[in-house]
Swiss-Prot record:
It comes from Rickettsia rickettsii (strain Iowa). InterPro entries: aa-tRNA-synth_II, aa-tRNA-synth_II/BPL/LPL, Anticodon-bd, Anticodon-bd_dom_sf, His-tRNA-ligase, HisRS-like_core, HisRS/HisZ, HisRS_anticodon. GO terms for cellular component: cytoplasm. It comes from the Bacteria. It is found in: Cytoplasm. One of its GO terms (biological process) is histidyl-tRNA aminoacylation. The keyword Cell cycle does not apply. It is an enzyme of class 6 (ligase). Keywords: Aminoacyl-tRNA synthetase, ATP-binding, Cytoplasm, Ligase, Nucleotide-binding, Protein biosynthesis. This is Histidine--tRNA ligase. GO terms for molecular function: ATP binding; histidine-tRNA ligase activity.
């Protein structure tokens, strides 16, 4: 018996009904982005693995456990993209776009992470991604956060989310804080999870993201980053809060919300929900002024961005997405097919969606049409063909018309 082929675990087909919802979400988000001056771009799905090694760090979960990385036939180490930000920065550098900064880019498409599949968390999933490159200051961060809010509003889920906000401060703030954090965690070194023991020497701030219950109990009494803000960091965060209040953006300050990579600074944020269980983050982002230099640019480039999971958004509510219902053309006999094809072609040039049903018995063809919830059927038999007429049945109104092409066009375009 021939093996029945299946998709890879954690990778799902997007069937028409799913794709319809995805398309709706993307279009809504794109339209909001346009109002903020964002332009769409795309990058390859496959990049050199070093693009992500540099951006995410070799000790990160994504690089150490989740990335789809392999040698291609040229013996180059390449990877399926696990996120967009590194790809966008790489593109700006390789296309020498630095002189055009600031730039606002919107991207969307699949990303890949080898993780345990569950609802709202697949190995191939789709993201909306926004990057504001080359602009610094709290006003830029406020504008970016308002964009995120407006996207969630357009998708009718903003009311079910909470904006969790924190400041990572400047480099000096984080340097001092990291020292204090290590001093505190060293007292609990033997109690930390094995993963956190490794992170303690490599990237201690990542321990704050640990999912281990034991680690969480230890972290609960750890020093808080805000205690070590410089005057500059305090002023930056206070300015951001002022702008958000003016814009009417509601937020909850979460002092434990951090990013474990050195190139992140100042603003970090997540929009979370209680509707999706453990997969509570819908949209997340932050400021990453140091990434471009790490990736080979001569200088730091100020930047802020965020990504949102399309599958998770789709789980938040049911979207009743309307779609164009095609008109069905049904030639009665084989000798009516040529005339039917002419009619179909003429109607399509008038931007009317048409499907010709010419295969099988009339009853079966009619059943297929009923299954599509069509409104109009055009019957073409010998009489219609001889008189250059069309018989149109309106299934909703339960009315029937025999009209010429011009009248048919008028009826179908109503």
């Amino acid at each position: 018996m021939t093996e029945q082929l299946q998709p890879l675990r954690g990778m799902k087909d997007l069937l028409p009904d799913d794709y319809k919802v995805h398309d709706y979400i993307i279009n809504k988000a794109r339209d909001v982005g346009v109002l903020y001056g964002y332009k769409q771009m795309s990058t390859p799905i496959v990049e050199y693995t070093k693009v992500f090694n540099r951006s995410m760090g070799e000790s990160s979960d994504v690089i150490s456990k989740e990335i789809y990385s392999f040698l291609d036939k040229s013996n180059d180490c390449v990877a399926l993209r696990p996120e967009f930000t590194a790809c966008i920065i790489r593109s700006i550098i390789s296309n020498r776009l630095q002189h055009k900064l600031p730039l606002k880019f919107f991207s969307t498409g699949p990303v890949f992470r080898y993780d345990r599949p569950q609802a709202g968390r697949q190995r191939q999933f789709h993201q909306l991604n926004y990057e504001y490159i080359g602009a610094k200051g709290a006003i830029t961060d406020a504008d970016t956060l308002k964009l995120a809010v407006d996207i969630l509003k357009a998708l009718e889920i903003e009311q079910d989310t909470t904006l969790e906000l924190n400041s990572l401060g400047c480099n000096e703030s984080r340097r001092v804080y990291q020292q204090k954090l290590v001093e505190y965690l060293n007292d609990f070194k033997e109690q930390l999870s094995e993963e956190s023991k490794i992170r303690l020497s490599k990237n201690p701030m990542r321990i704050l993201d640990s999912k281990s219950e034991t680690d969480q109990k230890i972290i609960a009494n750890a020093p808080v980053l805000s205690e070590y803000y410089t005057d500059e960091s305090k002023e930056y965060f206070e300015e951001l809060i002022q702008y958000l209040d003016i814009l009417g953006v509601k937020y909850s300050i979460n002092p434990r919300l951090v990013r474990g990579l050195d190139y992140y600074c100042h603003t970090a944020f997540e929009f979370t929900t209680k509707k999706l269980g453990s997969q509570s983050t819908i949209l997340a982002g932050g400021r990453y002024d140091g990434l471009a230099k790490i990736m080979g640019n001569n200088d730091d480039v100020p930047a802020i961005g965020f990504a949102a999971g399309i599958e998770r958004i789709a789980l938040m509510r049911e979207y009743d997405v309307s779609e164009v219902k095609p008109v069905f053309v049904l030639p009665i006999g084989k000798n009516n097919i040529c005339y039917a094809l002419e009619i179909v072609d003429k109607l399509r040039t008038e931007n009317i969606a048409i499907i010709i049903e010419s295969l099988g018995k009339i009853a079966k063809r009619m059943q297929r049409i009923f299954n599509e919830n069509a409104q109009f059927i055009i019957f073409i038999g010998d009489e219609e063909q001889a008189n250059n007429n069309l018989k149109i049945k309106d299934l909703k109104k339960e009315e029937e018309y025999i009209v010429d092409f011009a009248k048919a066009l008028e009826l179908l375009k109503k």
